[in-house]
């Protein structure tokens, strides 16, 4: 967890302690979906394929259902979903027409509330159900919230899962558990809880219908049934409080992880006839049996020959609502709470000014870039009477190079201001120190005079002082040609976050201002291919740097992406020397641009060794002074 996130969490916790009102019901269910009457169909589609449960039914599409009167809006505004109750059928022909609707979306854990004015009555041959199922059965699970067959008058709640899942934990419920194994190991039975009489069929309708509520969480699943006269006030008000719901009809919790066994459920409502369940137990339900040896055939005969009995085999829905956890309810009374969070994407306004100066035939470009950025601003405020507690956190944006300006302590844990201005001075030629272990180390260089290709990368080094830096010192040459070293301060580690989609201002500066100075001679493939280390007698030149800005100088290190601070000091003065030597043993300082594939200097070393003649070193320092 990031430090900024921990501070935000801590701030919220502190506010909750100081002002208890803002901690009010942080786990309350908040409304996610609300569909009423005919608008329910805006979120469902009609299933018109063969019945997966082998029912004696013909599911029709929406246009046909509407023209046939199987789907309509009632005078009260509720949604009617019925079946054909006019046509006599033949057993060998298509089954009775009906509708099956399925939600367009899949849903996960939450509180599901369906207000039902009427459900299919207790009629032989019927199998109505309101249920959910995942895209991969039984892996994603199935929850039968309302289900009954034939002359049902008590709802049966059934769960189906993969593998084994025992829910016989003895949890308190008003229903009776008749099977505790939900897994496919038990076949297609599933775990079953049978509700009290009056929870479905004709008795349900005689009470004016009611509300079913299902709470689906990681560790358990609870289902309540509320008759029309006993619906909890919190449900009516749209702010459900499950703690006031009382004992559920079913409390299913057991050996399996419900979070894994039930995922991505779509809602389904249908009415089929006969099928595997209703047809299989047709003779056990007190229904007329025409063929004692074949209860399924007896069911089909009854359904085909008695259309009028199915006039009451319809659903009438008032609403379907889905609530989910995660919101904070509004607090009423003398205490009030407000929480606002703003997350601004990294914004940067850059201005660049360039000036060119000429001295001793050389030129230098001074480019100053000012970057202002504000990111990840989080504000949490709470009001209690006339007192106010506010916590504001601002994280300054950083570049992709993980740069830290010298004026800001990267380890500072105090909130910073909303804006931060960082100035960069580029095109500063200097010799950055390198690690002795780096590939470009100069302590053990070859003295082969025939090696003539070397790349000197102009980089930008940070200066700790905020005052004007008129020059950047180079490595001091030793008179005995021994290695000279220039210590470098270690950079402060950066704890600031870099926005994923924000462009690095450091990259932009480097692209515009980085130059290279090359010492060239006839390349020797034999020596060049053997080592990328330059000889120790190369003349390193640097153009004059004149800065009137009170901003730090930086070195942008391409390979290590870190900033290295170079101490400020006045360079020594030397008399100018001849910059060009000719002949087989000579080097030329004629510069030409190049783009090295492997940068020579990384900017993270502790020292660098350069062996050169006194005259050459004097020439270098003279150029720096000028």
Swiss-Prot record:
Domain GH16: 33-286
A molecular-function term among this protein's GO annotations: licheninase activity
Membrane topology: Lipid-anchor; GPI-anchor
Official protein name in the record: Endo-1,3(4)-beta-glucanase xgeA
Lineage of source species: Eukaryota, Fungi, Dikarya, Ascomycota, Pezizomycotina
Compositional bias per record (Low complexity), positions renumbered to this chain: 477-494
Transmembrane intervals: none
Role summary: Mixed-linked glucanase involved in the degradation of complex natural cellulosic substrates. Active on laminarin. lichenan, soluble carboxymethyl cellulose but not on pustulan.
Family designation: Belongs to the glycosyl hydrolase 16 family.
Highest rank taxon of the organism: Eukaryota
Active site: 142, 147
Biased composition (Polar residues): 495-533
Species in which this protein is naturally found: Emericella nidulans (strain FGSC A4 / ATCC 38163 / CBS 112.46 / NRRL 194 / M139) (Aspergillus nidulans)
Keywords assigned by UniProt, alphabetized: Carbohydrate metabolism, Cell membrane, Cellulose degradation, Glycoprotein, Glycosidase, GPI-anchor, Hydrolase, Lipoprotein, Membrane, Polysaccharide degradation, Signal
Main location: membrane
Keyword tRNA processing carried by entry: no
GO cellular component: a single term: side of membrane
Residues cleaved off as propeptide: 604-626
Glycosylation sites noted in the Swiss-Prot or TrEMBL record: 61
């Amino acid at each position: 967890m990031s430090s900024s996130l921990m501070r935000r969490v801590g701030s919220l916790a502190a506010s909750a302690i100081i002002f208890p009102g803002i901690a009010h019901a942080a786990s309350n269910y908040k409304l996610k979906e609300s569909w009423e009457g005919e608008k329910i169909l805006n979120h469902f589609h009609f299933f018109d394929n063969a019945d997966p449960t082998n029912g004696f039914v013909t599911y029709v599409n929406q246009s046909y259902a509407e023209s046939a009167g199987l789907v309509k809006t009632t005078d009260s505004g509720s949604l009617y979903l019925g079946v054909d109750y006019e046509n006599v059928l033949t057993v060998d022909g298509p089954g009775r027409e009906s509708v099956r609707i399925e939600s367009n979306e899949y849903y996960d854990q939450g509180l599901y509330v369906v207000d039902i004015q009427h459900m299919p009555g207790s009629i032989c041959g019927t199998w109505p159900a309101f249920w959910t199922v995942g895209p991969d059965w039984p892996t994603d699970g199935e929850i039968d919230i309302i289900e009954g067959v034939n002359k049902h008058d008590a709802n049966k709640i059934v769960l189906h899962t993969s593998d084994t899942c025992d829910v016989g934990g003895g949890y308190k419920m008003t229903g009776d558990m008749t099977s505790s194994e939900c897994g496919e190991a038990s076949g297609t039975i599933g775990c079953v809880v049978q509700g009290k009489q009056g929870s479905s069929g004709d008795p349900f309708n005689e009470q004016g219908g009611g509300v079913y509520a299902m709470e689906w969480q990681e560790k358990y699943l609870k289902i309540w049934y509320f008759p029309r006269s006993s619906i909890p006030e919190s449900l009516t008000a749209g702010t459900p409080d499950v703690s006031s719901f009382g004992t559920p009809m079913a409390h299913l919790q057991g050996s399996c992880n419900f979070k894994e066994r039930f995922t991505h459920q779509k809602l389904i409502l249908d009415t089929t006839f006969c099928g595997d369940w209703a047809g299989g137990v047709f003779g056990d339900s007190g229904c007329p049996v025409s063929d004692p040896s074949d209860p399924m055939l007896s069911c089909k005969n009854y359904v085909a020959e008695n259309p009028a009995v199915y006039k009451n085999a319809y659903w009438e829905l008032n609403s379907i609502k889905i609530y989910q956890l995660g919101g904070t309810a509004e607090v009423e009374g003398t205490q009030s709470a407000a929480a606002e969070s703003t997350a601004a994407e990294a914004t940067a306004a850059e201005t660049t000014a360039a000036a060119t100066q000429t001295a001793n035939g050389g030129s230098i470009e001074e480019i100053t870039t000012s970057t202002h950025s504000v990111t990840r601003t989080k504000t949490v405020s709470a009001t209690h009477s006339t007192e106010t507690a506010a916590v504001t956190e601002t994280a300054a944006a950083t570049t992709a190079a993980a740069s830290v300006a010298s004026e800001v302590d990267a380890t500072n844990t105090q909130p910073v201001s909303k804006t931060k201005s960082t100035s960069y001075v580029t095109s500063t030629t200097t010799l950055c120190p390198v690690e002795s272990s780096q590939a470009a180390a100069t302590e053990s260089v070859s003295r082969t005079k025939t090696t003539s290709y070397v790349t000197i990368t102009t980089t930008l080094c940070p200066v700790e002082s905020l005052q004007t830096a008129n020059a950047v010192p180079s490595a001091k040459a030793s008179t005995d040609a021994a290695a000279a070293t220039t210590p470098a301060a270690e950079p402060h580690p950066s704890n600031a976050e870099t926005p994923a989609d924000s462009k690095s201002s450091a990259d932009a500066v480097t692209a515009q201002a980085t130059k290279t100075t090359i010492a060239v001679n006839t390349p020797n493939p034999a020596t060049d291919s053997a080592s990328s280390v330059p000889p120790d007698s190369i003349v390193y030149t640097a153009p004059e740097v004149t800065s009137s800005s009170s901003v730090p100088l930086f070195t942008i290190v391409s390979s290590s992406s870190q900033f290295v601070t170079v101490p400020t000091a006045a360079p020594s003065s030397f008399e100018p020397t001849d910059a060009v030597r000719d002949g087989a043993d000579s080097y030329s300082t004629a510069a030409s641009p190049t783009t090295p594939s492997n940068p020579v200097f990384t900017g993270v070393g502790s020292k660098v060794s350069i062996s050169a003649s006194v005259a050459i070193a004097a020439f270098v320092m003279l150029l720096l002074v000028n």
